[in-house]
């Protein structure tokens, strides 16, 4: 529900693949602003260009061609084939994973690994005539009935054979993924109540976006952080240092913190500005 207004705004401005392939990059980022994962929107445009050029403006209808497109992996390719093209495939999203874990009562780490779940999902079978509806029905079953907390088993069509229901145990075992902890020194330059930002060509995260000048600190013995921010699978510990001098060039960018909403900036940068102003 949270992303619906973003989706509607996106489709209103970019109704088809051809328009997406030509859409102005700054306006595209502005439309995406607030959703995070900016690599996804960059990949969307890259994919749109390829689809227009190589596939006659239509998404390919086979797994290998779909996976060759930027940003499309196993799940997305499976979801497109099942939902858009009615292929007899079950895309393994978080909701279907949850149904599967409870239905089969999977309680060990080795059982909830992606490879095993891909194999076990075959128990749900497929539909040859209504594959799209069937795939979405399984997703909705997880989202609306087999919820993470307080599953509504009375309404579940699978409860009679569900092993978690039989054992009255609905706790879920999650595959352990430890976030990588990183350390950065962030340099703050302030002049006339404005902050200096630079275009990021240095780090893999937020590539080509405006961020504060930063330096990565590897394996520090002592690190007194001022704040930490979560980004994807990374926890960023940040130490802030105020500076007086900086080598200016045309790629520098000054922002007024009182007009933050007027700039096209990643949420990461906005959070730091708000922290500095608090």
Which ranges hold each PLM region?
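Catalytic cores of DNA base-excision repair glycosylases
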Residues: 1-152, 158-161, 167
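Intrinsically disordered, low-complexity, charged terminal extensions of DNA damage-control enzymes
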Residues: 128, 140-278
């Amino acid at each position: 529900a949270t992303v619906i207004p973003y989706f509607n705004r996106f489709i209103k401005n970019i109704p088809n693949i051809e328009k997406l392939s030509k859409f102005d990059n700054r306006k595209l980022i502005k439309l995406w602003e607030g959703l995070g994962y900016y690599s996804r929107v960059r990949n969307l445009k890259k994919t749109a260009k390829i689809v227009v050029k190589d596939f006659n403006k239509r998404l390919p209808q086979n797994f290998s061609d779909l996976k060759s497109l930027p940003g499309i992996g196993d799940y997305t390719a499976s979801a497109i084939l099942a939902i858009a093209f009615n292929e007899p495939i079950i895309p393994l999203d978080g909701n279907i994973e949850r149904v599967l874990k409870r239905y089969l009562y999977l309680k060990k780490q080795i059982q909830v690994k992606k490879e095993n779940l891909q194999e076990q999902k075959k128990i749900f079978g497929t539909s040859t005539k209504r594959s799209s509806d069937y795939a979405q029905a399984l997703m909705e079953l997880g989202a609306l009935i087999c919820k993470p907390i307080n599953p509504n088993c009375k309404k579940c069509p699978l409860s009679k054979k569900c092993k978690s229901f039989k054992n009255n145990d609905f706790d879920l075992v999650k595959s352990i993924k430890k976030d990588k902890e990183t350390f950065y020194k962030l340099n703050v330059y302030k002049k006339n109540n404005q902050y200096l930002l630079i275009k990021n060509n240095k780090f893999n995260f937020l590539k080509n976006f405006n961020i504060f000048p930063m330096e990565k600190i590897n394996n520090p013995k002592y690190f007194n952080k001022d704040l930490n921010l979560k980004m994807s699978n990374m926890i960023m510990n940040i130490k802030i240092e105020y500076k007086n001098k900086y080598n200016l060039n045309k790629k520098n960018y000054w922002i007024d913190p009182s007009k933050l909403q007027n700039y096209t900036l990643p949420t990461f940068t906005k959070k730091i500005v708000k922290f500095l102003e608090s």
